[in-house]
C-alpha cells in the first residue's frame, strides 16, 4: 500500500523492487510518443498528440485555481480514463479522520504545500485501489509538484503528455476568492465575474459567474484556504517550485503550455483543438 513511500525513502539497493510494485499499479502502456513543447495559441497545430494510439497517461500542471480539475475531469469523461486529483485525495483524507487528517489540516490551513511523503502515500493507495478495479490509464492532476516526484513517476511509467495550464495572477486570485462549494453535494461554483486586460498585448480575459441553482444558494460555503492571503501564499510557493518541474518535462519534449483564453466556453474547444480531439467523435464512439 505504501509502495511510493518506500520508493521515496529507499536506497539505490532496494529501489528496483519498489519500482516494480508501483509499475503494476500504474498499468504502463506502450512506449510514449514525444510531444513538442509549445505554448498555445502561438502554434496550436504542431501538436502530435494521438490519444487513440494507446492508453492515455497524462499529467496536468498549473497554479492553484487555474482549472486543472475542471479540464482534467472533462477529458477523463471524454476519454474514459480515471481523473486522479491529489487535491481531492487530500480533502478525502481530511474528511476521513484518518491518521494523517490532523497533520494535513494544519498544513492546508497555513496555505503550505503538502509534503512529498504524504502525497506519495495517498497517491499510492489510490493507484492500488484503481488497479483492483481494472482501471487503465490516468490523468494526474496536481502531481508531480517537485522534480523528485517527477523523477519517481518517470522511473515507474511512461508519461505521454504534460499539459501546463496558465492564467495571469490577477485572474487566479479572483477565481480562487470566488470559489464556492455546496455543503451537501460538494459541487463547485464560482461567483466571481472576471474581465481583465490580457498581459503583453494578449486579448482580454473574461469569465462569467457560474451561478448555482436557487435551491443551492443558501448551502454554499467557502473553502477555509480560500482567503486572499492564503491564495497569494499558495501561488508564491507554487511558482517557486513549479519552474524546475516544467523544465524537467520541457527537456523531454513532453510539455504543452496552454494559456487559457477565458472561461470554459472559450477554453474547452481550444484545448480540444491542441490535443487533436473531436468531442463529437468520442461521444459517438461505443467505447467512449
From Swiss-Prot:
Transferase among keywords: yes
Chain's role: Catalyzes the reversible transfer of the terminal phosphate group between ATP and AMP. Plays an important role in cellular energy homeostasis and in adenine nucleotide metabolism.
Provenance organism: Solanum tuberosum (Potato)
Keywords on record: ATP-binding, Cytoplasm, Kinase, Nucleotide-binding, Transferase
Positions with a binding annotation for ATP: 65-70, 179, 262
PROSITE patterns cross-referenced by the UniProt entry: ADENYLATE_KINASE (PS00113)
Protein name per Swiss-Prot or TrEMBL: Adenylate kinase
GO cellular component: cytoplasm; mitochondrion
Catalytic activity, EC: 2.7.4.3
Region span, LID: 178-226
Disulfide bonds: none
Amino acid at each position: 500500500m505504501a509502495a511510493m513511500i518506500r520508493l521515496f525513502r529507499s536506497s539505490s539497493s532496494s529501489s528496483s523492487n519498489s519500482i516494480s510494485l508501483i509499475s503494476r499499479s500504474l498499468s504502463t502502456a506502450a512506449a510514449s510518443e514525444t510531444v513538442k513543447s509549445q505554448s498555445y495559441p502561438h502554434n496550436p497545430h504542431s501538436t502530435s498528440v494521438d490519444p487513440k494510439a494507446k492508453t492515455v497517461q497524462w499529467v496536468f500542471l498549473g497554479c492553484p485555481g487555474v482549472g486543472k480539475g475542471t479540464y482534467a475531469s472533462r477529458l477523463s469523461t471524454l476519454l474514459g480514463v480515471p481523473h486522479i486529483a491529489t487535491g481531492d485525495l487530500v480533502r478525502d483524507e481530511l474528511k476521513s479522520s484518518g491518521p494523517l487528517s490532523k497533520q494535513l489540516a494544519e498544513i492546508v490551513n497555513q496555505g503550505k504545500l503538502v509534503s512529498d511523503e504524504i502525497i506519495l502515500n495517498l497517491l499510492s493507495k489510490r493507484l492500488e485501489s484503481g488497479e483492483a478495479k481494472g482501471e487503465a490509464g490516468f490523468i494526474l492532476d496536481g502531481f508531480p509538484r517537485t522534480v523528485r516526484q517527477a523523477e519517481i513517476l518517470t522511473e515507474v511509467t511512461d508519461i505521454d503528455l504534460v499539459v501546463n495550464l496558465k492564467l495571469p495572477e490577477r485572474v487566479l486570485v479572483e477565481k480562487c476568492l470566488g470559489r464556492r462549494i455546496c455543503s451537501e453535494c460538494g459541487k463547485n461554483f464560482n461567483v466571481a465575474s472576471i474581465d481583465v486586460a490580457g498581459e503583453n498585448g494578449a486579448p482580454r480575459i473574461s469569465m462569467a459567474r457560474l451561478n448555482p441553482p436557487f435551491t443551492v444558494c443558501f448551502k454554499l460555503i467557502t473553502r477555509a484556504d480560500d482567503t486572499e492571503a492564503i491564495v497569494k501564499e499558495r501561488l508564491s510557493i507554487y511558482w517557486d517550485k513549479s519552474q524546475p518541474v516544467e523544465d524537467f518535462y520541457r527537456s523531454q519534449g513532453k510539455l504543452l503550455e496552454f494559456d487559457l483564453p477565458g472561461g470554459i466556453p472559450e477554453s474547452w474547444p481550444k484545448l480540444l483543438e491542441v490535443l487533436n480531439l473531436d468531442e463529437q467523435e468520442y461521444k459517438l464512439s461505443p467505447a467512449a
